[in-house]
């Protein structure tokens, strides 16, 4: 990662033991990289699924909440983890200039219901989500001013409960399918932007030990490799529930710019309240 001034300044405002730049170096023979198995990570993983990268790395794919736990347990060395988990690490390092963010509407993280927002009495929370659930709570209490009952879920059955005054937070590829079914769709990234004027960062690449500058440069290059092939990557997925070309190019933001890091900072500040 480039040690630019904005990153260094921002790192000082992250949780006390979270850093953007390494202090020491660790050497690993085969680095395990935990990534999210959603469509939005396909461009990031494009440069990691080649023989050269896989000679020194192993990819582990799962949904966001599991990747965070795998990092904590040492199952993976680097993980694309929900931003909401950053304060839970005793010490953490953001090791890439890339992640999963949205400048406006993200399309794949939404609250779905059959009634308007003010009439929702119960919300079922997607079991695959951490940052999205935290964002929903912030929007409810800080901006929407609603207090429905929140229900944790454990399996895919929760989507069938979107009826009457019961709503559900749905993330990832399943959100595209749910968009076709629900009457009301509240895009959480768009709502966040409307209230704060900032982008929202959903996930960042994190390690619990510092990585070498050489490795960070290589890892950034791997993340960047797919950015010039978004149309080709979209076409290769053969996905019909949503226009992936539009999704990759206009809904998802991959580079962690200064403005996007400001959005992350604001989210972490509000997260302390909850």
Task: Locate the predicted segments by residue.
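Domain-level signature for soluble enzymes in the chorismate/prephenate branch of the shikimate pathway
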Residues: 2-3, 16-274
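Cationic, low-complexity basic patches in intrinsically disordered or flexible, solvent-exposed regions
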Residues: 10
């Amino acid at each position: 990662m480039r040690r630019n001034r904005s990153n260094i300044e921002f790192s000082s405002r992250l949780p006390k033991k979270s850093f953007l730049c390494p202090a020491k170096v660790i050497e690993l023979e085969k680095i395990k990289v935990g990534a999210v198995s959603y469509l939005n990570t396909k461009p990031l993983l494009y440069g990691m699924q080649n023989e050269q990268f896989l000679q020194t790395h192993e990819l582990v794919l799962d949904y966001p909440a599991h990747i965070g736990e795998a990092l904590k347990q040492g199952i993976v060395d680097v993980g694309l983890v929900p931003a909401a988990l950053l304060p839970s690490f005793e010490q953490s390092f953001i090791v890439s200039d890339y992640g999963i963010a949205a400048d406006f509407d993200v399309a794949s993280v939404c609250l779905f219901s059959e009634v308007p927002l003010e009439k929702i009495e119960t919300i079922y929370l997607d079991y695959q989500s951490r940052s999205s659930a935290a964002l929903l709570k912030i929007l409810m209490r800080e901006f929407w001013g609603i207090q429905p009952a929140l229900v944790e879920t454990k399996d895919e059955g929760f989507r069938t409960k979107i009826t009457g005054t019961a709503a559900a937070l749905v993330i990832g590829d399943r959100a595209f399918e749910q968009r076709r079914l629900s009457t009301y769709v509240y895009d959480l990234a768009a709502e966040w932007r409307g209230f704060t004027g900032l982008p929202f960062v959903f996930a960042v690449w994190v390690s619990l030990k510092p990585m070498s500058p050489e490795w960070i440069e290589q890892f950034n290059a791997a993340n960047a490799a797919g950015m010039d092939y978004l149309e080709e990557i979209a076409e290769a997925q053969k996905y019909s529930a949503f226009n992936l070309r539009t999704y990759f190019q206009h809904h998802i933001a991959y580079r962690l710019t200064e403005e996007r890091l400001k959005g992350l900072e604001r989210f972490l500040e509000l997260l302390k309240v909850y």
